């Protein structure tokens, strides 16, 4: 390619291209620090090396590492959800299952079509697909790390015995994925929960705070879901534009290498512009995916976890009201009064316990998400400005070269 278009290291450098953990503004302390220090992809499985540093007396050592798979993360998440003691807390959303099928399929198709393209085109596309695979891999690791960090930062969940076993037990936990029967059971449980949710949602809350939160979270969840879908379309559009620039640039380069005439030199210079513009457009897509799309996806899952908390509280409120009615009937009939009183007291205690912790959880959730969105949106705006300046610089340099000024 012809030299002359200086892309400027200030705009197109490769610094900070690594995918960092999705920012959720985690408030952790030095007493328990968890991270994923390494990860290894083996066919359809990813093995995560979970590294822990702790000064808590519950652990035998101050620093240790174990190897865990995705199914073990799901087991830990499900153990929190199924524990009645945690009914009043927002359970950190489980990380999504690793999925590299699309990237592997693209690499396979590229290998099959190697004979129909030039060596330069094949090398360039192979590098891009490998970079895409690596980005997905890093994102997968980040999502699993965020889950562990959220648990480690929680004042109650961090004390859970299963969590300590997950972090410290250096053998296989013998956790398997759910079979078809268990998946079917989960499906019916979700159907029953959805139907019950409709009944529970019709109950007027006795506390204005929770009534407001329920209305807000329903609207918030739907808005985030819509924004997430639109953000994905936006990043795909930028990626498609980058792919189009690549095809146009390759075609112009092929035309430019046909001869040494002025028009061929012109094609080579414009081809170089398209190649460098493609890189910027691809980075715009990657930045939007990391800073916005991933954040929206995370808070879509966390807002669902907050809705689940409110459902559990509403379910507890309905049980408490039903227990009050049952007690009134028992007293009227003067039958099984002691049993009804005991049941009513237990329901009351459960409802009050959930309400007390749920209020603080929802306040913390608001603080966390506002800080996360503020940080990511500011960073995204700064990156968008940087890329826009990079595009402007490239166009100015290209015009200068074409006009013969340099």
Curated annotation (Swiss-Prot):
It is found in: Early endosome membrane; Cytoplasmic vesicle; Cytoplasm; Nucleus. It holds the Pfam family PX. GO terms for biological process: intracellular protein transport; retrograde transport, endosome to Golgi. The gene is SNX6. Residues 182-199 are annotated as: Membrane-binding amphipathic helix. The PX domain mediates interaction with membranes enriched in phosphatidylinositol 3,4-bisphosphate and/or phosphatidylinositol 4,5-bisphosphate. Residues 2-179 are annotated as: Interaction with PIM1. A 1,2-diacyl-sn-glycero-3-phospho-(1D-myo-inositol-4,5-bisphosphate) binds at residues 41-47, 100-106, 114-117. Forms heterodimers with BAR domain-containing sorting nexins SNX1 and SNX2. The heterodimers are proposed to self-assemble into helical arrays on the membrane to stabilize and expand local membrane curvature underlying endosomal tubule formation. Residues 203-406 form the BAR domain. The modification N-acetylmethionine is found at residues 1-2. It comes from Pongo abelii (Sumatran orangutan). Keywords: Acetylation, Cytoplasm, Cytoplasmic vesicle, Endosome, Lipid-binding, Membrane, Nucleus, Phosphoprotein, Protein transport, Transport. It is a peripheral membrane protein. Residues 26-173 form the PX domain. InterPro entries: AH/BAR_dom_sf, BAR_SNX6, PX_dom, PX_dom_sf, PX_SNX6, SNX5/SNX6/SNX32, Vps5_C. The modification Phosphoserine is found at residues 116, 194. This is Sorting nexin-6. In vitro phosphorylated by PIM1; not affecting PIM1-dependent nuclear translocation. One of its GO terms (molecular function) is phosphatidylinositol binding. Belongs to the sorting nexin family. Its main location: membrane.
């Amino acid at each position: 390619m012809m030299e002359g278009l200086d892309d400027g290291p200030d705009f197109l450098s490769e610094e900070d291209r690594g995918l960092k953990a999705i920012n959720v503004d985690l408030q952790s302390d030095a007493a328990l620090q968890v991270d994923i220090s390494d990860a290894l992809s083996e066919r359809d499985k990813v093995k995560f090396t979970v590294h822990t540093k702790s000064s808590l007396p519950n652990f035998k050592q101050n620093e240790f590492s174990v190897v865990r798979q995705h199914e073990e993360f799901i087991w830990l998440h499900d153990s929190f959800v199924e524990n009645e003691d945690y009914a009043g807390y927002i359970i950190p959303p489980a990380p999504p299952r690793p999925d590299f099928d699309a990237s592997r399929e693209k690499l396979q198709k590229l290998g099959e079509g190697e004979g129909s393209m030039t060596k330069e085109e094949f090398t360039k596309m192979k590098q891009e697909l490998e970079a895409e695979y690596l980005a997905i891999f890093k994102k997968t690791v980040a999502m699993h790390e965020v889950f562990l960090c959220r648990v480690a930062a929680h004042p109650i969940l961090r004390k859970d015995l299963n969590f300590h076993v997950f972090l410290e037990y250096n053998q296989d936990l013998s956790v398997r994925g759910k079979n078809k029967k268990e998946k079917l059971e989960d499906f019916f449980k979700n159907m029953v929960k959805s139907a019950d949710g409709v009944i529970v949602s019709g109950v007027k809350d006795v506390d204005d705070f929770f009534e407001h939160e329920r209305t807000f979270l329903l609207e918030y969840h739907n808005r985030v879901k819509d924004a997430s879908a639109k953000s994905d379309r936006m990043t795909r559009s930028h990626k498609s534009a980058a792919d189009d620039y690549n095809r146009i640039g390759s075609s112009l380069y092929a035309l430019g290498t046909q001869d040494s005439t002025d028009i061929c030199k012109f094609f080579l210079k414009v081809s170089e512009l398209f190649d460098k513009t493609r890189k910027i457009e691809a980075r715009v897509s990657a930045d939007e995916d990391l800073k916005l799309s991933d954040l929206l996806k995370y808070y879509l899952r966390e807002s669902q976890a907050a809705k689940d908390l409110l459902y559990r509280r509403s379910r507890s409120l309905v049980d408490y009201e039903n227990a009050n009615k049952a007690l009134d009937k028992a007293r009227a009939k003067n039958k099984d009064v002691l049993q009804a009183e005991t049941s009513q007291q237990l329901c009351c205690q459960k409802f009050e316990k959930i309400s007390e912790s749920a209020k603080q959880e929802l306040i913390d959730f608001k603080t966390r998400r506002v800080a996360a969105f503020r940080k990511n949106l500011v960073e995204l705006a700064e990156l968008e400005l940087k890329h826009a300046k990079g595009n402007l610089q490239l166009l100015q340099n290209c015009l200068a070269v074409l006009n013969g000024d340099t």
